[in-house]
Amino acid sequence: MSSQALDSAKIAFIEAAIEHGVLLFGNFTLKSGRQSPYFFNAGLLYSSSLLSTTAQAYAKVLSSSRIPDFDVLFGPAYKGISLAAVSAVSLYQQTGKDIGYCYNRKEKKDHGEGGTMVGAPLKGRIVIIDDVLTSGKAIREAIDILKASPEAKLVGIVQLVDRQEKGQSGSGKSTVQEVEEEFGVPVEPIIGLDDIVKYLESSGKWEKELQEVRKYRAEYGVQRS
């Protein structure tokens, strides 16, 4: 693990997530069946203060060198919708970059403007905004939506949390690493498991939780490339 200190945006996001019960420590059963000592519930990102902190963290990653220049943020329904919207606003406030955002409907609308897409036209260079990549099924469905739009080109994915753990495919790689290799685009998180460990180490208040997370990482963890 890198010894590099956490930056202020990551610290602010982790502290806000813990304060609002979004990042929890305990014993949780994941969809994969694994018993995890921590859990991130993006469904609780509903307060204005927490959304503001989250949006600022997204904007910082979106303006980093790892994410190529882009035109539109795509937030897959449903959790990605609000995340894409607030990220677009925060990015403009931080950098002055004026980009569009859009999202999909789960069901096609046959009245009014119709269609399955809402917001900016799905064309040009697209970055997908999402919460947590687990099996990779949801992100592949989002990418399929882009493939149906011939003028859209995926250039990157930004997610809230990279669990940095081995996927279910047996490759020994994380879902994030598999998606990066399969689609040839960077997948950047606001925070990863290593960042959570660093925060627990530096706080000095979470010794029991730190030991459990370390054990989990030792068994399932994958180092980011």
Swiss-Prot record:
InterPro entries: OPRT, Or_phspho_trans_dom, PRibTrfase_dom, PRTase-like
A GO molecular function held by the record: orotate phosphoribosyltransferase activity
GO biological process terms, semicolon-separated: 'de novo' pyrimidine nucleobase biosynthetic process; 'de novo' UMP biosynthetic process; pyrimidine ribonucleoside biosynthetic process
Binding annotation for orotate: F39, F40, T134, R163
The reaction(s) this protein catalyses: orotidine 5'-phosphate + diphosphate = orotate + 5-phospho-alpha-D-ribose 1-diphosphate
A Pfam family: Pribosyltran
Alphabetical keyword list: Glycosyltransferase, Pyrimidine biosynthesis, Transferase
Disulfide bond sites: none
CDD domains: PRTases_typeI
Annotated SUPFAM superfamilies: PRTase-like
A GO cellular-component term linked to this record: cytoplasm
Pathway this chain belongs to: Pyrimidine metabolism; UMP biosynthesis via de novo pathway; UMP from orotate: step 1/2
Enzyme Commission (EC) number: 2.4.2.10
Binding site for 5-phospho-alpha-D-ribose 1-diphosphate: 31, 78-79, 105-106, 109, 111, 130-138
Subunit structure: Homodimer.
Annotated function: Catalyzes the transfer of a ribosyl phosphate group from 5-phosphoribose 1-diphosphate to orotate, leading to the formation of orotidine monophosphate (OMP).
Membership in a protein family: Belongs to the purine/pyrimidine phosphoribosyltransferase family. PyrE subfamily.
HAMAP family for the chain: PyrE
This protein's name: Orotate phosphoribosyltransferase
Source organism of this protein record: Cryptococcus neoformans var. grubii serotype A (strain H99 / ATCC 208821 / CBS 10515 / FGSC 9487)
Gene: URA5
